[in-house]
Amino acid sequence: VVYELVERRVLVRDLEVGMYICRLDRSWHETPFPLQGLAVHSDADIEAVGRYCEYVFVDTQRDVAADIRPQVLRRTEPSPVRFRRSQVYQDTARFDDELARAGEAFDNASACMEEIVDAIVQGQVLDIEVVARAVRPMVDSVMRSGDAFFWIESLRRRDIYTYQHAVSCSALAAAFGRHMGFDQETIVSLAAGNLLMDVGKSQLPDELLLRAGPLDAQEMALARLHVEEGLGILAHSGVMDVDVRDIVGSHHERFDGGGYPQGLAGAAIPLAARMAAIIDTYDALCTPRPYREAVSRHHALREIYAGRDSAFQGELVEQFQSCLGVYPTGSLVELTSGEIAIVMVQNHARRLLPRVAVLTTREKAPLDDFRIVDLMRQVGHEHVEVGRSLPPGSHGIDPKEFFLQ
């Protein structure tokens, strides 16, 4: 289906009285303006829009102004996202104190996701209360200490990709929303949407989902139906949350218009879905599949960064990288001393000096027990920092063997 848009992109400085704004360069929820649109009645209206946006889309069918100067957005040109944090969150729990609650929240979310999929397969409606039970403890844990939750998540990755991917994406959405300064209810909606974004896959054949190799064109077309199926499940279940619906319906859209199902581009893609596209791709890269190995979290961030201003909105990519850090929690790294370690807690002031668990000697021989080192609090003459990221399984090391005994 081809949709003919009646919108024109206009820089705020080129707005004129009489124009009707139907879409912003960000979510309406980030502004004080009404969700249904905004008529420009005066220069004061233009000034107010300029406090939040660089550009907008005007409805040409409702536009009474003449000589609109359209601006062409090249696919390689960044589109600004000047979000204003409503809140700046601080950790309220120590990493060590939050670990038990983070583990419980992770296990709860995984069990709830399994319950959700089983119910849908049996023809039952999606119970949004089950989704809330899965999401809220996880959001609460991430709000208290994101490092603790992602440490647990890195050690409990399962072979059941659908469940694990859903839970990981949900937690990443909570962390991303926290970093962006969204209010907690919005963060819960983002987490719920990311938990459910692939729920439509429950309606696809198992042999398609478990395929060990690349899909042919016919199989790919069938796989893409999970978006439509997911929206159908939400509608049948009476789920009205706008962010959840936007994420399920548009997380495969791409900023340059190269995604599906509608080929939306730029600000036509809802903000929640633009964020979900980054999250979905990042976690998929970090997760092993039958047809490829997982990449390191650091490498996954580099892959996402390579897609900025094409597949993904550049400013959101930068915010996501800032949220997770150069070497995200759970990353296997080699220190400049030669020792192998895994990142436990971020140091947001000095990204190369996190708190780590050292797993080997300088000669790469496994330690009998790991040693926790805060690289910010080193004593002595040698200054050790993170040297480079390592692929999962490097030097035959499985962190689970150290921490899940």
Question: Model-derived features: where do they sit?
Answer:
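Membrane-cytosol interface segments
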Residues: 1-126, 380-405
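Histidine- and acidic-residue-rich, metal-dependent catalytic cores
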Residues: 99-405
